[in-house]
Amino acid sequence: MKLKVLSAVPYKGNSIYELRKILSQNDVDLYVFPEGFLDSNTLTEALKIIKNEQKYIITGFKDLRNNGQHKVLVIDNGKIVDEYTKCILTKGEKEKGKQHGEKITCVNTKFGKIGVLICYEIHFPEVARIMSLEDPIMLINIIGTGMYHDLQLEQWTTLAKARAIENEVYILGCSHYEEEIPLAYVYNSVGRCELMKTNECGGFVVEVDLDKSNAKVINYLEDRVPRLFNVLSE
């Protein structure tokens, strides 16, 4: 089975306009928008648009009622059907008093479970691995801003490739388009790059081969020795 997915790189600061534009220009199975794309002030109008367009969306959401806590929402034809709260925060986010989520878990979608790593969480293999225990059809990495420099871009995409390889699953990522280096990427379940866009805005469409994500040719999960990993939780 193949899933047609759009990875959105919208201009930051005008989410309703960007939402209308991207939804009207493309017809796919699943739309993915970056971290903080919607917030408490734009959510109601966005839900109406998504309902009218009859679309299925995974988007970043900034909960202004909870000090800007970052979440991911799964929206089916204008209805929020699941959500996940960012669990691993940057030093800057903690200094601002943001609260982390209490459970690392996949979100449920009509296509199957999907693990959504919110921005900085890509740096922690434990997050993707915990999500992979739920046998997701793919991983998604929604990013707030773009990359600040070429080195960060190289590091970030290398980490994404590693997450794909070690979990034998597709991973898709996207950021906003602003002054930094915006990007959209896709790595397949063996770590081969199927999409890499930098310094471009808009919606980028790929076909995710779910059979490849399900194959688990090596199946690293079966070779884990969890009792030896206890030190990670100390």
Pin down the residues of each PLM region.
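Active-site-proximal beta-strand elements of phosphoester/diester hydrolases
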Residues: M1-K12, V32, G112-E121, I140
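Active-site donor-binding loop signature of nucleotide-sugar glycosyltransferases
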Residues: P10, T85-K86, T109, N199, ...
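Cys-nucleophile CN-hydrolase/nitrilase-fold catalytic domain and related Cys-dependent amidase chemistry
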Residues: G13-E83, G146-I165
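CN hydrolase (nitrilase-like) catalytic-core segments centered on the catalytic cysteine
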Residues: L43-T59, P125-G203
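Active-site catalytic loop in hydrolytic enzyme cores
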Residues: N67-E134, M147-T158, K212-N230
